[in-house]
Amino acid sequence: MILKLVLYDNPILRKKGMPIDSFDDRLKRLVQDMLETMAYYKGVGLAAQQVGLNLQLAVIDVSGSKLSSSLLIGGKPAMVEEHMPLFLINPTLSYTQSKEISNEGCLSFPGLRIDVPRSKRVKVKTFDLEGRPWYFEAGGFLSVAIQHEFDHLQGKLFIDYLSAEQKKAIKEELEKIKRGEAILSVKETD
């Protein structure tokens, strides 16, 4: 089921998600609905806050991206595509390398792209849909997507990385989104 997407300036986007404590069929259904919603809106990541839920849950799928990603599981290289989609459930991150600038968009900010400083690599502890912990390290575009979604789970938005001057430069775009005048891109249907 396609869920209603929450756009900027909805207050839920500023809420830190509550930990997930039930790894049941409801969680599995929600994850499936979030994946369908993310695909419908042509995204690579979607946090629970973006569908109006105050949870520590995000879904990511970078398998269709042309941008380079890397993944280490148990310290060994793994094929990124084989581990997509990826679920972040009650995640914690450790940032492992220097920063680089990433040009990012966000489903909650239709049409807006900004440059954001991100760590080149992240170490992640998360849980699978059965509640089992697992650990991995990500680099490249996957690392960026994870950091972007993790920020959502903390109530932080990518515009928070902008200076006051940079925010002033995009003020009209933000006002358009608030007024509902921004156009969302959706998946073509047959």
Curated annotation (Swiss-Prot):
Known catalytic reactions: N-terminal N-formyl-L-methionyl-[peptide] + H2O = N-terminal L-methionyl-[peptide] + formate
InterPro entries linked = Peptide_deformylase (IPR023635), Peptide_deformylase_sf (IPR036821)
Q: Where does the record locate the signal sequence feature?
A: none
Q: Which residues bind Fe cation?
A: C106, H148, H152
GO terms for biological process? Answer: co-translational protein modification; translation
Q: What does the record give as the organism's lineage?
A: Bacteria, Pseudomonadati, Verrucomicrobiota, Methylacidiphilae, Methylacidiphilales
Q: Name one Pfam family in it.
A: Pep_deformylase
The name this protein goes by in its record: Peptide deformylase
Report whether Phosphoprotein shows up as a keyword of the record: no
State the free-text cofactor note.
Binds 1 Fe(2+) ion.
Superkingdom classification of source: Bacteria
* Gene name, Swiss-Prot/TrEMBL: def
Q: What is its EC number?
A: 3.5.1.88
Q: Which cofactor does it need?
A: Fe(2+)
A GO molecular function annotation here is: peptide deformylase activity
- Name the keywords, alphabetized: Hydrolase, Iron, Metal-binding, Protein biosynthesis
